[in-house]
From Swiss-Prot:
Protein's name according to its UniProt entry: Large ribosomal subunit protein bL36
A molecular function GO annotation: structural constituent of ribosome
One cellular component term from this protein's GO annotations in UniProt: ribonucleoprotein complex
UniProt keyword terms in alphabetical order: Ribonucleoprotein, Ribosomal protein
Domain of life: Bacteria
HAMAP family recorded: Ribosomal_bL36
Source organism per UniProt: Ehrlichia chaffeensis (strain ATCC CRL-10679 / Arkansas)
Claim: Ribonucleoprotein is one of the keywords in the record: yes
Family of this protein: Belongs to the bacterial ribosomal protein bL36 family.
GO process terms (BP): translation
Amino acid sequence: MKVIGSLKSAKVRDKDCRVVRRKGRIYVINKKNPRFKARQGY
């Protein structure tokens, strides 16, 4: 999982990427291609 400052570029990398919020953190998840996972990092 990558930790990046802005999820804007992460969510457009693949059409199956979804932005979800868990425990106050924002994540990008992708069920079909899990290597696109990312987390907002501040």
